């Protein structure tokens, strides 16, 4: 997927032309009924045509974009509302508690596009291949890290050491091969037989609606983050317990002590760094725009 800077794509092709609908009315009931039917059909066609016109980031001007509340997509799209030299000029942002809710709103023509992490976007498109696609240009690149309370620097340091080791020994690559590259026969990470947990249990806060990073399968939370967290905890001598919650509640849960760390495809941003510490990054992704075909 090609990636360009915000300024570069804002200097690219101009905005799409707007579609204008007009309808006539009649005093006869039969004509009124026919007119209403035609108007409804025309409105539906217009909505479809409007969405189909989104072929580039510039085409988002005047459109409504759906995001998951509190995510990087939410932060980025909120900055693009309105007019300005460095803005996309979108009409508004609709926030949803779950990414799937945003995609459903797109499928039912309630919004014009969805901004979400690229790997997550790929899974939604794969599940709806006849209806959805993504723009060829990624919106922004980002790096994921683990959120830890500023009051727990020892845990941050320990996790950083374990992250470095699991990158070096190929464990992280094995997990990514399973969930992203989808290498045939890739098994990801499985705790070695006889693994012990002398240091107790660490609680991880997540939002299990973010396939392939964390999602529920057969009643269990699985995915890149869940599996990598298990590998990290095994390395440090801790058992792992995962708590599922709204994404926007994760940082508060960690800071309050309800969870030891947060891991949910979480991007390191200056705003979040004011509230919480982050480990070294372990994965890089980009924001993608999902639209109707």
Task: Set out the residue ranges of the language-model regions.
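Bacterial lipoprotein signal-peptidase II cleavage site
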Residues: 24-44
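Extended ligand-binding regions for polar small-molecule ligands
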Residues: 25, 40, 71, 122, ...
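Acidic, polar ligand-binding/catalytic clefts
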Residues: 49-60, 129-139, 150, 230, ...
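Ligand-binding clefts/hinges and TM-proximal coupling segments of bilobed small-molecule sensing domains
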Residues: 72-93, 134-135, 163-199
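A ligand-binding cleft/hinge motif common to bilobed small-molecule-binding domains
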Residues: 75-81, 100, 105-140, 249-252, ...
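Extracytoplasmic small-molecule ligand-binding "clamshell" domains
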Residues: 92-95, 197-266
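Periplasmic-binding protein-like
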Residues: 118, 122, 126-160, 189, ...
């Amino acid at each position: 997927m090609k990636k360009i800077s915000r300024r570069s794509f804002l200097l690219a092709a101009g905005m799409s032309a707007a579609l204008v609908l007009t309808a006539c009315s009649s005093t006869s009931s039969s004509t009124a009924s026919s007119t209403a039917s035609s108007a409804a059909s025309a409105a539906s066609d217009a909505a479809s045509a409007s969405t189909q016109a989104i072929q580039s980031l510039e085409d988002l001007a005047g459109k409504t974009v759906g995001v998951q509340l509190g995510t990087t997509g939410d932060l980025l799209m909120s900055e693009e509302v309105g007019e300005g030299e460095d803005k996309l000029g979108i009409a508004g942002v609709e926030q949803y508690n779950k990414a799937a809710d945003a995609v459903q709103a797109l499928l039912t023509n309630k919004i014009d596009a969805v901004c979400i992490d690229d790997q997550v976007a790929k899974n939604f498109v794969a599940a709806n291949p006849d209806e959805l696609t993504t723009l060829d240009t990624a919106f922004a690149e980002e790096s994921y890290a683990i959120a830890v309370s500023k009051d727990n620097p020892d845990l941050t340091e320990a996790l950083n050491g374990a992250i470095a080791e699991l990158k070096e020994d190929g464990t992280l690559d094995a997990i990514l091969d399973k969930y992203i590259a989808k290498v045939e026969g890739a098994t990801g990470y499985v705790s070695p037989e006889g693994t012990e947990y002398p240091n107790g249990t660490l609680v991880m806060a997540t939002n299990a609606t973010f396939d392939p990073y964390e999602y529920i399968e057969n009643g269990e939370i699985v995915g890149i983050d869940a599996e990598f967290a298990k590998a990290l905890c095994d390395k440090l001598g801790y058992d792992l317990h995962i708590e599922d919650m709204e994404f926007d509640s994760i940082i508060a849960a960690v800071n309050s002590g309800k969870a030891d760390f947060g891991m949910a495809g979480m991007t390191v941003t200056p705003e979040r760094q004011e509230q919480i510490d982050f480990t070294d990054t372990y994965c890089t992704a980009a924001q993608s725009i999902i639209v109707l075909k």
